A protein has these predicted regions:
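Glycine-rich, aromatic-flanked loop segments that form ligand/cofactor-binding clefts
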Residues: 1-28, 48-72
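Active-site-adjacent helix-turn-beta-strand microarchitecture at beta-sheet edges
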Residues: 36
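Conserved beta-strand positions that form and line the central face of beta-propeller blades
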Residues: 40
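Second-shell residues forming the walls of enzyme active-site clefts
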Residues: 43-168
Length: 168
């Protein structure tokens, strides 16, 4: 993880980049997940969180700002958010999917955390019953920033994805 972030980060730096929309921080617990699959570090929470931590450290050491994605976790869905608006079970979100983000994001207690989080286009009913996370003040401001203490930048996944355009 660290060598990946460091090596990839140095390559990006050489061509003038300073931000990367990586690493995928989803715990892929749904075997039929059509979009996360091999992009994830796996289905084990401790492994995923440790690999995210190492990768973030490598990117930061290379001078690249990494992005944790797809908050609050897209690994339990059976739908592709490029095509549909997936939903995530609230208990899974809290118990499994938040940890790779909360363990590795920029906060007052973790000044070496990732400074960017990309929100996923999904309905996380435990956060907001009515709006996808990517356009939810409850999920982004109340939960991510205020409750969890994220101090960095929040970006949205692509706005041409059906997961969000079908909702708007």
């Amino acid at each position: 993880g660290r060598q990946y972030g460091l090596g990839y980060g140095h390559d990006l730096k050489q061509v003038g980049m300073n931000v990367v929309f990586s690493p995928v921080s989803d715990v892929n617990i749904e075997p039929d997940n059509p979009i996360i699959g091999p992009r994830s570090f796996g289905s084990s929470l401790p492994r995923v969180s440790a690999m995210i931590n190492a990768t973030v450290g490598g990117f930061l050491d290379a001078g690249i700002a990494p992005t944790l994605k797809h908050w609050p976790g897209h690994g339990a869905t059976k739908e592709d958010s490029h095509l549909h608006l997936p939903s995530v079970d609230a208990t899974l979100t809290d118990a499994i999917h938040l940890a790779p983000f909360t363990d590795n994001m920029l906060t007052q207690k973790n000044v070496n955390g990732a400074p960017i989080i990309m929100s996923g286009h999904l309905l996380a009913k435990g956060l907001d019953q009515n709006r996808p996370v990517s356009i939810s003040k409850i999920a982004l401001t109340n939960k991510l920033k205020k409750e969890l203490g994220f101090l960095g930048v929040i970006v949205s996944d692509a706005l041409n994805m059906r997961g969000i355009t079908s909702f708007l």
